């Protein structure tokens, strides 16, 4: 059962925070031991989103990854592998959606979900937590996004091996030139540049955006059809953690 709870940010804190389609087109494969905190979230064994391990029983991902009409019993987390053909399946106890998340009509603001696992993960070299970066990423700094999203547009082709995208953090003013007021300070824009043909895509959603080895964002949405002419958008985690824990 999907849960909408005021305890949402507390759960994140004790852990360590068409439709929206978020691609890694033009990424490179990455070994599982390099990013042991990345998990695959699957519905009936089909990959739908990525996620990040915050504790032995908590995974952080995007709210839009879940269809509440299907119920949590059809979803599971797969950890410990960089391949969609592998991973240890862990059942989900509950899913807590950010209480202020609305969805497409609000441009996916607060697109965060906390997944609590039925059983704790057993940590190893391929299963580890990631810490949250506590402040803003400076403009034009290099960040990395990870996912199993579409790699070939327009075909629905998911890679078996986890992909890494090197991209840049774009400031809010520059991002709003593309997305206008739809993008706000609690969102993080990612930009690889015009004409690169590289970016995020469907099924990358929920995956981590990482800066200096720490989690700075959760992949949220991109331009429909994974058109790389506009910046990709993630949830920026730092506003949720300024001055310790702060509810938004």
Curated annotation (Swiss-Prot):
Which keywords does the record carry? Blood coagulation cascade inhibiting toxin, Disulfide bond, Hemostasis impairing toxin, Hydrolase, Protease, Secreted, Serine protease, Signal, Toxin
GO terms classed as biological process:
proteolysis
Q: What is its EC number?
A: 3.4.21.-
Question: Taking the first listed entry, what is the main subcellular location of this protein, grouped into a coarse class?
Answer: secreted
Positions of the Peptidase S1 domain: 24-248
| Active-site annotation | 64 (charge relay system), 111 (charge relay system), 205 (charge relay system)
Q: List the disulfide bonds.
A: 49-65, 175-189, 201-226
Gene Ontology CC terms: extracellular region
Which Pfam family, giving just one, matches this sequence? Trypsin
Q: Which family does it belong to?
A: Belongs to the peptidase S1 family.
Q: What is this protein called?
A: Tabserin
